[in-house]
Amino acid sequence: MALLVWQDDLNIGIDVIDQQHRRIIEMLNHLHVAQTSMQRAAVGEVIDEVVDYTMSHFAFEEELMEEAGYPFCAAHKRVHEVFIKRVAEYRLRFQAGEDISDELRTMLSRWLFNHIRGDDQAYADQVKAHLNQFAREHQSGGWLGRTLKRFFG
């Protein structure tokens, strides 16, 4: 499998989320490099990094959806929970000595691309509107308003 390449249709228009998604894709490419160089310890480190980073990304994304009052937030959270359980199973298989790198990378890339293009695009407009409203309300707030605009505007 070749290295993954960011595609413009993966942008949801919330800069911080788009940057986090790009970082996950970079990690998947690191997984590929570690696997092709036959470095099992490096593969394990990348798997741990992907899992940890993805969980923090999900928590951040879910907080944004909740704050924006996104009506399908609970369903979106359940999708995240199922994904985390699935990846945890791969992690256990790896720890048991199984070579799951290709299978995991394929599953992760397909899932991520489909999730961004579907589930994440679905909440983007509502979250952007909420963030823009918040920034407008706090625009005179100096640093906070500028920071919010930089990250979310």
UniProtKB/Swiss-Prot annotation:
Binding-site list for Fe cation 1: 21, 57, 61, 120
GO molecular function, one term: oxygen carrier activity
Binding site for Fe cation 2: 61, 76, 80, 115, 120
UniProtKB keywords: Iron, Metal-binding, Oxygen transport, Transport
InterPro entries noted in UniProt: Bacteriohemerythrin-like, Haemerythrin_Fe_BS, Hemerythrin, Hemerythrin-like, Hemerythrin-like_sf, Hemerythrin_metal-bd
Organism domain of life: Bacteria
CDD domains (alphabetical): Hemerythrin
PANTHER family the UniProt entry points to: BACTERIOHEMERYTHRIN (PTHR37164:SF1)
Complex and partners: Monomer.
Family under the similarity heading: Belongs to the hemerythrin family.
Function according to Swiss-Prot or TrEMBL: Oxygen-binding protein. May be involved in a storage mechanism or for delivery to oxygen-requiring enzymes. The oxygen-binding site contains two iron atoms.
NCBIfam families: bact_hemeryth, hemeryth_dom, PRK00808.1
Protein name: Bacteriohemerythrin
